[in-house]
Design a protein with these regions (language model features):
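C-terminal structured "cap/appendage" subdomains that terminate the fold
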Residues: 103-172
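An acidic, gly/pro-interrupted, aromatic-rich
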Residues: 1-115, 158-182
Length: 182
């Protein structure tokens, strides 16, 4: 949805960002060498796998164990998943990219909310959702503008007015954290 996924086929395993503690104390040594550039955004098929050092995101989001064939993945919705979506660098980068995209739309706020929502969830928001999202955007924008929150930290690098970009990033984080998106 954010446009970060790198579509290259084939190649060596990649190491997306994950907590440093995941590589500590494993049998056989070795750590997690976080990939850089576009390799950070490869499909999970290319993620390095080692039984003694699982990729945390796979475990958090019900990834199969790789020990047996699985015809249908289990699905769940847990607080740990919500916390991961709000705090993991991978998802924050995706939200920042969507926030930058929203700023570049140069449309009215209501229209941008509608387009961002549809881009993420493949359906337009109903009237109640539209009002709630616009209210959230306005509240966050005002908080960033007043200096209550660090706009630069939330928005990341990019063009356009930083408070606006940060507010769109915050809204993108909300949409990406919905059960419907997961």
């Amino acid at each position: 949805v954010s446009g970060l996924l790198y579509q290259k086929l084939g190649g060596p395993s990649v190491f997306p960002p994950q907590p440093k503690s995941m590589g500590e104390g494993i049998y056989g040594g070795g750590g997690w060498r976080t990939s850089s550039g576009t390799d950070r955004y490869r499909r999970s098929l290319y993620t390095y796998k080692k039984r003694s050092m699982p990729f945390a995101l796979h475990d958090t989001f019900d990834g199969p164990s790789h020990e047996t064939c699985v015809a249908k993945r289990e699905t769940s919705n847990t607080p740990l998943q919500a916390l991961t979506l709000l705090n993991d660098p991978f998802f924050n980068e995706a939200a920042q990219k969507l926030g930058q995209w929203a700023v570049e739309q140069k449309k009215e706020e209501a229209q941008t909310v509608k387009v961002l929502f549809k881009k993420c969830l493949s359906r337009p928001p109903d009237q109640q959702e539209q009002m709630a999202l616009r209210g959230f955007y306005q509240k966050q924008f005002n908080r960033f503008k007043a200096g209550e929150l660090g706009a630069e930290k939330i928005a990341g690098k990019g063009g356009g007015e930083v408070n606006q970009r940060a507010a769109w990033t915050a809204l993108a984080r909300v949409i990406l954290n919905t059960d419907e998106f997961i």
